[in-house]
């Protein structure tokens, strides 16, 4: 819920390499008017797994840090993350998660931040 991207692992199992993602993200952030946009479906495994998760698995490799992600896009909308507080980042990401998973994400949000969503 913070905006970091894990694109090479499922759990602790590596499924791909980084490719050019890090270079592309850094280039976008360094260019005049550039923005990083992470576009993805909100779910995986035929809708059984949310791709927006409250925590990454311990030991999973972060491909792109939360500081480098400007926008995350799913079929449910756009979350603008740049310049947002951790609470606002989490709210924005929950807002673009698949509706079937939002309740669970909100529960974790409320536990973590000790406040109502």
Would you name each region that the model predicts?
Residues 1-117:
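Conserved phosphate- and dinucleotide-binding cores of soluble alpha/beta proteins
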